[in-house]
A protein has these predicted regions:
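Flavin (primarily FAD) cofactor-binding/catalytic cores of flavoenzymes
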Residues: 1-134, 149-237
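Post-kinase regulatory C-tail/linker adjacent to protein kinase catalytic domains
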Residues: 135-144
Length: 237
């Protein structure tokens, strides 16, 4: 969102972070400061003491797990993390095996992970996957959480979530997909962002299903001001 604002003409963009800065090499006119503490008219005062006048404020809450329609005994309560506790295989509610949560994790993998979760949940519902004993479920959750808590950087996080998704994949008949290629793509993508946050979108990757390499977009992202499908699909020599 911050980069979109910058791209389309904002003279300055200030990002207030909740816990840790993203730490990318921002272009001139963009910066990160500790989160917004209070507003006094048009003046924003941040937790680190920094203050400045602002024209617009965009509240980005991040992923918040909020299930007011569930009883407390069924409610997932967690911050945004790669392995929320009390979910066996990241899916099955530990205290009630008829309740399934999908997509609750902080994400590198997205739809391929969601698919594997859905396949796994389907097979539990259809009794194709037999859940282990309560003690084994507890041990499995604790082992995954312990691994997650030792992660120190994005590359380790990519490895962790790849292994988690592969674990789900191995338990069902999900169609063939190249997880090692996905792992490599994510790490390349992470390096591209670290190298230049303004140009990482200009890269091309191959499909982990077909192997087909996607064509590069005809216009660098920072110069592409028209997001219509007609312009996006246009061929330019």
């Amino acid at each position: 969102i911050a980069l979109q604002c910058y791209k389309y003409g904002a003279k300055s963009v200030t990002i207030g972070y909740r816990n840790n800065p993203m730490g990318f090499k921002w272009p001139e006119g963009m910066k990160e400061v500790h989160y917004l503490d209070k507003l006094e008219g048009s003046k924003a005062i941040f937790k680190d003491g920094h203050s400045q006048n602002i024209d617009a404020l965009i509240l980005c809450s991040g992923y918040l797990h909020y299930f007011p329609f569930l009883a407390d005994s069924l409610k997932l309560k967690t911050h945004n993390r790669l392995y929320p506790p009390k979910l066996y295989k990241g899916i099955v509610w530990q205290d009630n095996h008829k309740l399934f949560y999908l997509g609750m994790q902080d994400q590198f993998h997205t739809f391929n992970m969601f698919d594997c979760q859905a396949w796994y949940a389907r097979d539990v519902i259809m009794d194709k996957i037999k859940l282990p004993s309560d003690s084994e479920i507890d041990q499995d959750i604790n082992e995954w959480v312990a691994k997650e808590e030792k992660l120190q950087d994005p590359l380790q996080m990519i490895d962790f979530q790849t292994e988690y998704t592969k674990d789900l994949y191995s338990a069902s008949n999900y169609p063939k997909i190249d997880f090692e290629l996905i792992r490599k793509h994510f790490k390349d993508w992470e390096h591209h962002k670290e190298d230049d946050i303004m140009t990482y979108r200009n890269k091309s990757f191959s499909s982990p299903v077909t192997g087909t390499i996607a064509p590069l977009h005809h216009t660098p992202w920072s110069q592409a001001m028209d997001d219509s499908m007609e312009t996006f699909l246009e061929s330019k020599s």
